[in-house]
Amino acid sequence: MTALAAAGILTASAREKVFFFVAHPDDTIACAGTMFLMKDKYELHVGVLTHGERGCGEAGYRDGSTKAKRTLEEEAAEAMVGAKVHWFDEIDGDCYANRDVCRKLAALLQELKPRAVFGMWPLDYHLDHATSCMCLQKAVGIAGMRDRIEFYIMEESYDSRTFVPAHYVDITDVVERKRAFIRQHVCQNANDAMCAQEIADGEMRALRCASWMTNGNRGNVERFAVYDGKPQGSRCIFNELPPPKGWSQDWSTAKPSKYTPEGGMK
């Protein structure tokens, strides 16, 4: 075993892959802290459905300036966690889980063979977010990976309505790095408002952990749900991350909730 392997830092070729699929540049702020915790152990990939072309109004969409800005901002942010970005070039606000994009995504999944995939909440208030999850759901099926991949859902602070978390990740030790990640998205972070809101939401998630409040801890947390189809076997990627400090549950055997398109969370 090499010194790097002994330290838990593997070469890119030896790492398992983790794939995140989102609708817009900046959507991975929902899981950026977790990505920082994963970056030295896993090979990270991010698929982005659109370039967020309409994120600064129609004028910026028509002249292409918003697309150019947000593409550069996303590439810079994902470079901080060592993730490779894969663009799907659909149009912000006008994207669908159509055959071509789902097949393109399935082909990428077959190429990468990720251990785990992360998508957006399928009941999200923002239709592009929900669409991106539908694309990922269909692509996992097309790729023949439905019963042999870990499939998780990230919580988007602003729009993940009725979100029911199964896993909590303590990002307190990397929260300043997450701030820097969010601030790469300059055109969406006017007056640092997006950064302030996301960090405050993470602090509130920590306070909602009853065991944290009992033990008087303060920190920052990201939350994730489990999508139906994930095998509930001996492997769970969250078991390889540190649980929230003071967590009182049996972290490895706590039964997660699961989302099903027919019945919601159960």
Roles of regions detected by a PLM:
Residues 105-123, 132:
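Proline-aspartate-enriched helix->loop->beta-strand connector
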Residues 67-71, 98, 102, 129, ...:
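A structural signal for well-ordered alpha-helical scaffolds and beta->alpha junctions
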Residues 8, 80-81, 148-150, 154-266:
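The feature marks non-catalytic terminal segments
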Residues 1-113, 141-146, 236-249, 253-263:
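Active-site rim/loop-helix segments in enzyme catalytic domains that contact anionic ligands
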Residues 127-141:
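Short Gly/Thr/Asp-enriched flexible loops that form oxyanion-binding sites at enzyme active sites
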Residues 75, 137, 179-183:
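Non-transmembrane alpha-helical segments in soluble domains
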Residues 28-29, 53-56, 93, 122-129, ...:
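Active-site environment of divalent metal-dependent phosphoester hydrolases
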Residues 47, 118-120, 151-155:
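Short, conserved beta-strand edge motifs with alternating hydrophobic and charged residues
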